[in-house]
């Protein structure tokens, strides 16, 4: 039987507190299971302890962000659905994931999530 989309677990990786917390609250109100991390290192700890279906991550973060974070995701988590959010991306670096440019509407992000899950 197909899993209800809202049963999937979403990990938000965002270093800006206001964005991370309001996005978490928005998705939880919509019925999603949400985990949060403020940087790539925190995300790795969460990923070691939890089964995550979708990762929504900022590109530019002060701790394990940018190109190295993208390389890590591509190398070790290519089986996950990953959405990159950013106001700035390195144009010389190929990003193999869906990209949602900031600022974005939270409902637009939810549409991205549903598409990634094949809904």
Predicted regions and their residues:
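Non-catalytic signal-transmission and effector/linker regions of two-component phosphorelay proteins
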Residues: 1-9, 105-119
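Two-component/phosphorelay signaling modules centered on CheY-like receiver
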Residues: 16-35
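Helix N-cap/capping motif at the beta->alpha junctions
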Residues: 36-45, 66
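Active-site residues of response regulator receiver
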Residues: 58
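Receiver (REC) domain active-site loop signature in two-component systems and cognate sites
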Residues: 61
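A Lys-centered signature of the CheY-like receiver
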Residues: 102
């Amino acid at each position: 039987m197909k899993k209800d989309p809202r049963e999937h677990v979403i990990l938000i990786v965002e270093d800006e507190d206001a964005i991370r917390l309001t996005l978490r609250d928005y998705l939880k109100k919509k019925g999603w299971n949400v985990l949060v991390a403020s940087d790539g290192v925190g995300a790795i700890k969460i990923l070691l302890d939890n089964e995550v279906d979708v990762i929504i991550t900022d590109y530019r973060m002060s701790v394990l962000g940018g190109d190295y974070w993208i390389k890590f995701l591509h190398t070790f988590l290519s089986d996950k659905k990953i959405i990159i959010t950013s106001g700035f991306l390195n144009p010389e670096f190929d990003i193999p994931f869906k990209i949602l440019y900031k600022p974005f509407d939270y409902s637009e992000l939810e549409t991205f999530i549903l598409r990634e899950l094949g809904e």
